[in-house]
């Protein structure tokens, strides 16, 4: 007698993990199948894909700060799910167990850290201004330069050796007020990842570190606004649905007001000041479960000026800042194949202007007026198109490809 045993068929379970209230996608949410002992995480767009054997499965969906959700089902075909997790602020019994010593060595994300947004907002900071980069400075292997500045020295590297990404697009200058603040407004940020080593191939090469910042998509259910007043800056944010469950927007603005008070303590013939502002805006539209569109905008600027006026006139201004416009299209070709196409424009400008006028009285009573105007300009303009593909053939394997 001969016994023939056929292997079980495998099917793919894919979908998105969302916040139950705002319908924001959750980046890095965990999906674990208790029966087969395999799992995966959501990508930067909240999408997951996992291939499992045919039959009954019991999935745990979890994310920090949210209640664990269990889903049991019989998998007999490729299935797409949208999972909504609920906030859980209750602290149950906590059992602290130490990891095995080799856990960090065997991890595929060795050298990577995720910084929770509540941790950033609650970290004590200079002038009570919460800052993303200053929170990163508290991590092991990261140091700051001058006290109070936001520069990152990661494992001996310099600040110019770091790659800063905002929604996947590089920023060439991330400092405000000579490094006292960064351009990342905490209220507009959704996820922050720091890579100190073992950089994922999708980022290309970098000498020191990669700081990957993702911004909020906007609430698809309810309108919500907030106003924050600080010692250096004030922040205003408003978000809500344009078409409930399909289209949302978010607008976030921050500005300093040093320039409003500094002239009050200066001599009458002198004026000077400093100001900064950041504007973040995003439009998010879901065409279907397979197609989503994101349009992001960022503009930030620092402005320093000084002028005096008596018999002579002098004026000098320094301006620098970033402008970023980013359009991203997500498409699910198959349950195992996910793509993201990005069209991005990025501009960085640094300008110094000087204007000077002087008058010389001649013996014959005539006046000679000399004037000069100087402009020192430098900048970078980037226009890029890229497509990334993620293929998940097996739970423990992921294949990616990018076209730039």
Description of each model-found segment:
Residues 399-404:
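Conserved small/polar residues in nucleotide/adenosyl-binding loops
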């Amino acid at each position: 007698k001969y016994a023939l045993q056929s292997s079980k068929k495998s099917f793919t379970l894919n979908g998105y993990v969302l916040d139950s209230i705002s319908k924001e996608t959750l980046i890095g949410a965990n999906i674990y199948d208790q029966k087969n002992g395999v799992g995966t995480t959501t990508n930067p767009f909240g999408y997951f894909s996992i291939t499992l054997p045919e039959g009954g499965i019991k999935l745990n969906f979890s994310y920090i700060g949210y209640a664990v959700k269990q889903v049991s089902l019989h998998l007999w075909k490729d299935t797409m799910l949208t999972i909504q997790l609920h906030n859980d602020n209750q602290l149950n019994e906590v059992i602290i167990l130490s990891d095995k010593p080799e856990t960090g060595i065997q991890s595929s994300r060795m050298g990577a850290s995720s910084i929770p947004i509540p941790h950033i907002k609650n970290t004590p900071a200079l002038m009570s201004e919460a800052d993303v980069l200053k929170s990163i400075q508290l991590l092991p292997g990261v140091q700051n330069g001058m006290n109070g500045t936001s520069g990152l020295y990661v494992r001996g590297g310099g600040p110019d050796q770091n790659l800063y990404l905002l929604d996947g697009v590089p920023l060439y200058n991330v400092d405000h007020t000579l490094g006292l603040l960064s351009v990342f407004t905490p209220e507009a940020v959704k996820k922050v990842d720091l890579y100190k080593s073992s950089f994922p191939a999708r980022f290309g090469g970098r000498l020191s570190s990669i700081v990957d910042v993702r911004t909020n998509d906007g609430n698809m259910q309810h309108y919500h606004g907030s106003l924050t007043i600080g010692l250096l800056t004030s922040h205003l944010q408003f978000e809500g649905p344009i078409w409930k469950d399909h289209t949302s927007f978010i607008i976030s603005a921050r500005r300093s007001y040093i320039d409003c008070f500094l002239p009050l303590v200066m001599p009458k013939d002198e004026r000077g000041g400093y100001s900064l502002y950041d504007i973040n805006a995003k439009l998010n539209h879901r065409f279907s479960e397979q197609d989503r569109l994101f349009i992001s905008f960022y503009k930030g600027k620092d402005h320093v000026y000084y002028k005096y006026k008596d018999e002579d006139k002098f004026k000098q201004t320094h301006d620098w800042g970033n402008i970023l416009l980013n359009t991203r299209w997500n498409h699910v070709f198959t349950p195992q194949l996910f793509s993201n196409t990005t069209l991005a424009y990025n501009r960085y400008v640094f300008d110094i202007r000087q204007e000077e006028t002087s008058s010389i009285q001649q013996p014959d009573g005539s006046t000679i007026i000399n004037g000069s105007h100087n402009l020192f300009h430098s900048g970078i303009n980037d226009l890029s198109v890229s497509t990334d593909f993620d293929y998940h053939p097996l739970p423990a394997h992921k294949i990616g490809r990018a076209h730039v």
